[in-house]
Curated annotation (Swiss-Prot):
Subcellular location(s) per record: Cell inner membrane; Cytoplasm
GO molecular function, one term: protein-exporting ATPase activity
Organism: Azoarcus sp. (strain BH72)
Principal location class: membrane
Cofactor(s) named in the record: Zn(2+)
Function: Part of the Sec protein translocase complex. Interacts with the SecYEG preprotein conducting channel. Has a central role in coupling the hydrolysis of ATP to the transfer of proteins into and across the cell membrane, serving both as a receptor for the preprotein-SecB complex and as an ATP-driven molecular motor driving the stepwise translocation of polypeptide chains across the membrane.
SUPFAM superfamilies: Helical scaffold and wing domains of SecA (SSF81886), P-loop containing nucleoside triphosphate hydrolases (SSF52540), Pre-protein crosslinking domain of SecA (SSF81767)
Gene name tied to this protein: secA
Cofactor binding summary note: May bind 1 zinc ion per subunit.
GO biological process, one term: protein import
Official protein name in the record: Protein translocase subunit SecA
Length: 909
């Protein structure tokens, strides 16, 4: 009561904001005569003047009134369109990083030019994001004329474009494109191997059109790039033949006294690893030459043969460490992993690093190619990375809380330019679907008879086509519009306002194109204007005739009541229903809307079916009669609010899971960018190498252990096999009784540095540094992809922890952190091992080794929203994604450990 009284006295926050913006509108209007007096050249020169003022210390807010006045004048000169005062307010709302809710037909496309122009002046780029390629192309072409007139460049980012075209589009001052394409480009930019391959140049300011569709409906559906690595089926099969030909060494690892029978490889059960002996290296090379996998005289550790080493070790591990009916079972022609702790089958899980395929080759079952997720991100996390984010839509107010809670975006409802006079009728509720459809057909027939255009909204393509069949039976001409986007869609929608035209559309189809009463005349006018064979005087005469004919048709439609909207079912979200209603009543036009429902509709069944059915039976309502009361409409809207709240809770919970992986991706992508931008990463490689040798040493010689507990023989063998460091450790220990563990460690690290320096001395230093960087990038990418799969598996089952009285979110956070620690350790070990063992003999070999791996069958997915929501409700988990600001070296690590970033997950670099 008190809050209501205060609102009456001072107005709502929305009212107060509109009043504040109106002060600037008065300033812009005052500048109009002065700006209108400028020549075209002087008006264009304003852009350079604004940029100079910015360089001299002015802010964008200082420039706003004059910049908006300049854009308004450019709109008048280029398109004959003058921004209304309410459109100026919309532009200010966008500039302030808020959401502008503007009714359909209020000119949102034109509003975007104001904020886009102002924010493009600093030269950091502006992205204007729409829901499909058609709208992006249309808006870039139309609004690009205004920007071009003022000396700014416009780009259009479409899915079919090549790499060079995309770079050009992003280099423009203002870039139009679809949400999918901007997201995929971001992911692709984080998969490149050279900075020059990137297309985006930073995420500065985005204006999102249809912001509710993109930031709410699609916010939880990840964009996924997946692909198959090269098919190595033949290699797995051949290595499966090689493995049994190599002999396992019996007895100790390399202590000559404890070796019972020398062999080609040793098995370290403690480390779950297989290591080739010196004899094994030679024998393996001979066998590989014999079967044609290795050229005569080539070494196993040359750059071009690294893949052979990887597959050979996978085959040896499959034969020596993994046993049928203990570690796995063969079921229905597939290798299924057995959980070592519970003994349960883990269907769907696969070992990484080619091990699973090696086991499949061993068992003679079909070798399945790995289809990996290469990268993924949700729109929610992508858009939160922009320095400033703004949006426009006709229906945001119902979701204002979510926009504010998730994105920190405030929604401002912009007043209409003319009062809205559309009449929204109460819902009509029938007992059966048959009665409902009969009433819908009767209403449509009545409108056609009176010459009133009708737009019928359906919730699915199936219903769309069912109603089309009923209209065909009733011999009522109509046009069908499905959500499958095609270029003729805009043309169908544009003519949906002609007298007696019936259009059936799925609720989301055709957004972005206005339904003008009497039909859209702009296309025929443009055709006449562009016809060079017609003299100028005749052109004007034809255009005048077209406009006069349109005026008569327009008045005829207004007399019939304007556009009539029929909804055939309530959607789960009030916002979607409001979008359908909002197609009518644009710019103060008359119009009407009504929803026809039945107790057999899904939403009615869930929330109100039984109660209303009982009322209808009690009132003995005859067939074909409907309940029509405001109470029923309010009851349905209350049910919709409950569903919206449930969906919001799901999205919010999924975000909490997302943020865990989000922080990890932030670290990985930052490491990747630092690698790309650093020419010489030798210091990083050195720190990693020394760290890995230290960790290996402590595996065999634990801290604070006595000499009897040392496994010097195992350490000697591991150094020789994994790092080609052949050091007489046993002899050192025997010859020098006072040699302590720290002294041994120092000698090992010094020997590693010496061996590495000798390797670099053989080749050009710059080429070697490039090779180091590519090895690092490839390892990081490979293990990050495996990590994404591991997180996905973890997430799928984490909700079961609740049955053990554990908090699933906390468990997920803890285990995801452990997986990430393992990822970083694995990258360090792999890179160090490869660089220590690779044998470079010529510059050509180095160039060959630098080439990044090719991914085959790369696919781009964006999951269906309803599928994703259903899956989310079942598992309360989602695909991890990346976002957030850059982490400084001395900032707290985002993993939550409490350490500085450089001492925690930043230690990789």
């Amino acid at each position: 009561m008190i809050s209501g009284l205060l609102k009456k006295l001072f107005g709502s926050r929305n009212d107060r904001l509109i009043r504040q913006y109106s002060q600037n509108v008065r300033k812009i209007n005052a500048l109009e005569p002065e700006i209108a007096a400028l020549s075209d050249e002087a008006l264009r020169g304003k852009t350079g003047e604004f940029r100079q003022r910015l360089a001299d210390g002015a802010t964008l807010n200082d420039l706003l009134p004059e910049a908006f006045a300049v854009v308004r004048e450019a709109g008048k000169r280029v398109h004959g369109m003058r921004h209304f005062d309410v459109q100026l307010i919309g532009g200010m709302v966008l500039h302030d990083g808020k959401i502008a809710e503007m009714r359909t037909g209020e000119g949102k496309t034109l509003v975007a030019t104001l904020a886009a122009y102002l924010n493009a002046l600093p030269g950091k780029g502006v992205h204007v994001i729409t829901v499909n390629d058609y709208l992006a192309s249309r808006d870039a072409e139309m609004m690009g004329r205004i920007y071009g007139f003022l000396g700014l460049t416009t780009g259009c980012n479409l899915s079919r474009m090549g790499h060079a075209e995309k770079q050009l589009a992003y280099a423009a001052d203002i870039t139009y494109g679809t949400n999918n394409e901007f997201g995929f480009d971001y992911l692709r930019d984080n998969m490149v191997y050279a900075t020059g391959e990137r297309v985006q140049r930073g995420l500065n300011f985005a204006v999102v059109d249809e912001v509710d569709s993109i930031l709410i409906d699609e916010a939880r559906t990840p964009l996924i790039i997946s692909g198959q690595a090269e098919d190595h089926t033949d290699l797995y099969l051949k290595m499966n033949q090689v493995a049994p030909l190599l002999k396992r060494q019996e007895g100790g690892l390399d202590d000559k006294d404890s070796v019972i029978e020398p062999g080609d490889y040793t098995v370290d059960l403690k480390a779950h690893q297989v290591l080739l002996t010196e004899q094994g290296h030679e024998n393996a090379e001979q066998i590989l030459v014999r079967i044609g996998l290795l050229p005569e005289g080539a070494g196993l550790y040359e750059p071009g043969n690294i893949l052979l080493v990887h597959h050979l070790y996978a085959a040896l591990r499959a034969h020596a460490l993994y046993h049928k009916d203990q570690h796995y079972v063969v079921q229905n022609g597939e290798v299924v992993i057995v959980d070592e702790f519970t003994g349960r089958l883990m269907a769907g899980r696969r070992w990484s690093d080619g091990l699973h395929q090696a086991v499949e080759a061993k068992e003679g079952v079909r070798i399945q190619a790995e289809n990996q997720t290469l990268a993924s991100i949700t729109f929610q996390n992508y858009f939160r990375m922009y320095g400033k984010l703004a949006g426009m839509t006709g229906t945001a107010d119902t979701e204002a809380f979510e926009f504010h809670h998730i994105y920190g975006l405030e929604t401002v409802v912009i007043p209409t330019n003319r009062p809205m006079v559309r009449k929204d009728e109460n819902d009509k509720v029938y007992r059966t679907a048959k009665e409902k459809w009969e009433a819908v057909i009767a209403d449509i027939a009545d409108c056609v008879k009176r010459g009133q255009p009708v737009l019928v909204g359906t919730t699915s393509i199936e219903t769309n086509e069912y109603l089309s069949g009923l209209l065909n039976k009733a011999k009522i001409a109509h046009q069908l519009l499905n959500a499958k986007q095609h270029d003729s869609e805009a043309q169908i929608v544009a003519q949906a306002g002609r007298p007696g035209v019936v259009t059936i559309a799925t609720n989301m189809a055709g957004r972005g194109t206005d339904i003008v009463l009497g039909g859209n005349i702009e296309k025929p006018v443009s055709q006449v204007r562009d016809d060079d064979s017609v003299p100028a005087a005749e052109k004007e005469s034809r255009i005048a005739a077209l406009r006069e004919e349109w005026r008569k048709v327009h008045e005829q439609v207004i007399a019939a009541g304007g556009l009539h909207i029929i909804g055939t079912e309530r959607h789960e979200s009030r916002r979607i229903d409001n979008q359908l209603r909002g197609r009518s009543g644009r710019q103060g036009d008359p119009g009407s809307s009504r929803f026809y429902l039945s107790l057999e509709d899904p939403l009615m069944k869930i929330f109100a079916g039984e109660r209303l059915n009982a009322i209808m039976v009690r009132l003995k309502m005859p067939e074909g009669e409907a309940i029509e009361h405001g109470m029923v409409t309010r009851s349905l809207e209350s049910a919709q609010r409950k569903v919206e709240q449930r969906n919001f809770d799901i999205r919010k919970q999924l975000l909490e899971y997302d943020d865990v992986a989000n922080d990890q991706r932030k670290v990985i992508y930052q490491q990747r960018n630092e690698l790309l931008e650093t020419e010489d990463i030798s210091e990083t490689i050195q720190a990693m190498r020394q760290g890995v040798l230290h960790d290996l040493f402590r595996t065999y010689v634990p801290v604070d252990s006595v000499e009897d507990q040392w496994d010097i023989a195992g350490l000697e063998q591991a150094l020789a096999s994994d790092y080609l460091l052949k050091l007489p450790l046993l002899e050192w220990v025997k010859a020098e009784p006072n040699l302590d563990d720290e002294a041994i460690l120092k000698r090992i690290i010094d020997a590693g540095e010496e061996a590495y320096a000798a390797k670099i001395a053989q080749v050009d230093a710059a080429a070697w540094h490039q090779f180091e960087r590519n090895v690092m990038l490839q390892s990081l990418d490979t293990h990050w992809r495996e990590h994404l799969a591991a997180l996905d598996h973890l997430r799928q089952g984490i909700h079961l922890r609740g049955y053990a009285q554990k908090n699933p979110k906390q468990e997920y956070k803890r285990e995801a952190f452990e997986l990430f620690e393992t990822l970083l350790d694995t990258v360090r070990a792999d890179v160090s091992k490869l660089l220590m063992t690779v044998q470079i003999r010529t510059e050509a070999q180095l160039d060959e080794a630098e080439a990044p791996p090719e991914m085959e069958n790369v696919q781009y997915h964006h999951a269906d929203y309803d599928e994703a929501l259903a899956a989310a409700a079942a598992s309360t988990a989602e695909t991890p994604v990346q976002g957030g600001p850059k982490v400084g070296r001395n900032d707290p690590c985002p993993c939550g450990s409490g350490k500085k970033y450089k001492h925690c997950h930043g230690k990789l670099s």
